[in-house]
Design a protein with these regions (language model features):
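C-terminal motif of bacterial Sec signal peptides marking the signal peptidase cleavage site
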Residues: 16-18
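Conserved functional acidic sites
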Residues: 20-206
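Residue-level signal for mature regions of secreted extracellular proteins and peptides
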Residues: 12-13
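Bacterial N-terminal signal peptides that target proteins for export
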Residues: 1-9
Length: 206
């Protein structure tokens, strides 16, 4: 049995509960940060994670509290992150940086701290993962900083983070280390309320 703690900054993630199915998002108007990461209370996302070492592992992230514009997300390792939903986007007060920021258009960018920058590189990706097939997805790539790490996250409207990739090349050896998480299943808000097995779940290795 194996558990994997999720950390979105490094790539985290998964378990089957709700389901996605092949679908195009219902037209709900412009793509906004809130639609790309719908943080309704009780929502849960599960991911299959490839670490490059051993079999895939499972990771889970869920919204555990919503207080006004403040949202707390807890990962299966017990780590919590707090975000604020603002008019401009999704703000992380702990690091004083944006997770997602409007406008959602190719080339838009924002500072993510420690010399790193996030940039929107695509707004029309089609994604096929175990949770389903999704369209009009947005790719955000974060680069810079001393370690040269590149983090790419694909957000799909009315779904959330669907693919999370992190890769880094060792300066001395030139070897690349990579971690990739793909959405296995998800349930939003009331749909997830009846699911009570995510916290602290033990997952059997495939």
């Amino acid at each position: 049995m194996k558990k994997f703690p999720l950390h979105f900054a490094l790539v985290g993630l998964a378990l089957a509960l709700g389901c996605g199915g092949a679908q195009r998002p219902v037209d709900r108007g412009p793509i906004t940060p809130d639609r790309l990461y719908p943080m309704t209370e009780g929502s849960v996302w599960t991911y299959d994670v490839e670490t490059g070492v051993g079999p895939n592992v499972l990771a889970i992230s869920r919204v555990v509290a919503v207080r006004g514009t403040s949202v707390e997300i807890r990962n299966d390792g017990g780590q919590s992150l707090t975000y604020e939903r603002r008019a401009e986007g999704l703000w992380e007060p702990g690091s004083s940086t944006w997770l997602l920021r409007a406008p959602i258009e190719v080339g838009a960018s924002w500072d993510t701290g420690s010399g790193r920058t996030a940039r929107i590189t695509a707004i029309d990706e089609r994604v096929e993962v175990m949770a389903g097939v999704f369209e009009e997805c947005v790719r955000v790539e974060e680069t810079g900083g001393d370690d040269g790490r590149v983090i790419a996250t694909v957000y799909c409207p009315d779904v959330g983070p669907t693919i999370i990739e992190s890769r880094m090349t060792a300066q001395l050896t030139g070897m690349e280390a990579a971690v990739r998480g793909t959405l296995r299943a998800f349930a939003l808000g009331d749909e997830a309320a009846s699911y009570a097995g995510a916290d602290g779940v033990d997952v059997e290795e495939p």
